[in-house]
């Protein structure tokens, strides 16, 4: 079967199947609303309509809501590709986990059941042990450090490590920085001892909490508020947007800026789909993906700024971790680094040194 006809046939089948399955969609992950968006949200219908028969109709899986920055980034990507190809390549975005959660969409990508998806690095690490190095706690000095790593040689090397598994990362999306928040002021490692802190059910995060001297309590996202309110947890950790969206500031009003984890997200194309494309079309896809990442990061920054302003106005107390204390937190992570990246400590050192100021 001609590869163009195959892509169109598969696209038509998927469009019909997903329309029927929409009512069975899984709930979106963590944050459910967005601020700082343009007045008109992008949708599949926002794209210019060209009077042509498309060569390709591709599917794009997104587990967040329509107004979430990563979803809007996906729509922007689809628009850009549509415009660059004059309607020859069309991409349909399915938000709200219509096509499954991140774990299942990655599997579908690997075998060509889906064409594109946006997934968190924390989910992707199952397919590249090396990629654990990008999400180690207290690894990055700041956001600029992380972007320098992701968009440089290290980021390209780690992206390439996924290709043999059937995944081709295209660009990196922002997901903010995670901080702790508590029912009482906490500003030192000593004050962390014995606390119970809610974390996602991710082994690395549970290990991080234990190494800081606290107890990890894996609780579903929607139950964090009640767990803190009932005294089952002394606090939790997340970014400003999640903290605001779920009103956790009402029960844990002390927000500690420790910046323990930055976990980027990636826009991915299936290797099966990638192999269908010409060299010229691959270049268009890469360029449009990079532009959509810039757009998503702009939306994310606006969202976080507004979330922070809102919770501060409500009476939240922001606590800054001193450099001496942050070093203590960072030093406590050495066993975790060796556990998850023992074979890649040279890479970890390269990440640490990226963009580092020259010693005086």
Residue ranges and their predicted role:
Residues 2-13:
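Bacterial N-terminal signal peptides that target proteins for export
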